[in-house]
Amino acid sequence: MAKKTNSNCLVLVTGVPGSGKTLVGLQLVYTLDKLDEEINGVFLSGNGPLVEVLKHALGKESKSFVQPVHNFLKEYGGNVNSIPHENIWVYDEAQRAWDSDQVLAKRGHGNSEPDDIVKIGDRINSWSVIVALIGEGQSIHVGEEVGLPLWANAIEKSGKDWRIFCPEKLESDFSEFN
């Protein structure tokens, strides 16, 4: 839909730990890559050991579609002249995205990670889809405490219209955007 309508979409997928969110995200990126050469996706994770295991298990192909989220954001988040070739970003454990204080401490600028990802989507001249995989009750480190409201805040600050797709239990957080 996003490609056909040239629109930006945020898709929120929720579930308890172990419910298969990560697998769904990986399958989405992998399948889309095989189906359509014009659709490029990337699986982003802040879990370094998971990224390494996936890269090892998937071999050469993984380098193009599995990346550490912090490396991706170092390259594209703070650099307004750099635009990724992917239009679909699957962010695993998106409730653990860093707030602006943590990003400032780690990368030297004051946007939250959701701000950076949404701004990347805003810079793309065509369409983009962010799939945020949300683990319930899993914001566990400094800079991750705010959680889901960071995503609503980033969409609110965006200069573009974003379509939001989410479970009913999250609709009230994003109702003003649809």
What kind of region is each of these model predictions?
Residues 2-3, 14-19, 23-24, 28-52, ...:
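Conserved helicase motor core of SF1/SF2 NTP-dependent helicases
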Residues 1-9:
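N-terminal pre-P-loop "Q-motif" helix
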